Amino acid sequence: MVRAIVLVKSPKKLIAARLKRVNLIDESFPVSGQFDAVAMIQVESLAQIKDITTEIQKINGVERTETMIEVQ
């Protein structure tokens, strides 16, 4: 299993709710600070992480993302 956290910058207030609609995102919630939302992901491969982050970046209003992958 590969676990990752994707930080999302977006001026859209409901970005966390939109993230929940993305396939394979386990959880998402709004945060304060440099980013506006967090998406928690747990998948089988690194390639799936790339696919999910690409899908997130296509959401209208997403300005940038930063992905952190669990190191074991």
Stretches with model-predicted labels:
Residues 1-72:
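A compositional/biophysical signature of low hydrophobicity enriched in polar/charged and small residues
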